[in-house]
Amino acid sequence: MRRILFNTAMVLIVASPISYAEEFMNKEQRQATFCGKTFYGKNLINGSTFKIHIDSECKTNTIHFLTGKKAGKTEERKIISMSDEGELCHTSNRDYCNKMKNMGDGTYKGIGTSGRWKDKEYVKLSNIVDGNQL
């Protein structure tokens, strides 16, 4: 019985990082989901909300802040890269990168891979619609 429990535990330990990594969207999935679309976002760390549009070529995102310190302001950020694994990097005074998870309920959560939110789940996106609806 101990051997069965040990083997089961080992399988779970080894498989966990693999399944976790597979939860992130790849480049193709991110482009199909977000490029040429407008959606709502919430910063999970400070609570601010915004509406964002990413152009159809996935080169620029425009953010209109609804609440928080930047409420009422609009910023344009250049997307500087998107890896095949789905890591997207953009500029905002500094370069920030993230990976995105499809939560399966119409929402998406971003995990920082660089910058001040590295390794933190910091953004939730929802209500995706076609075109620029800012």
What are these regions (language model features)?
Residues N7-A15:
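Bacterial N-terminal signal peptides
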Residues I18-E76, D84-L134:
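Lipid interaction determinants
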Residues M1-I4:
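Positively charged n-region of N-terminal signal peptides that target proteins for export
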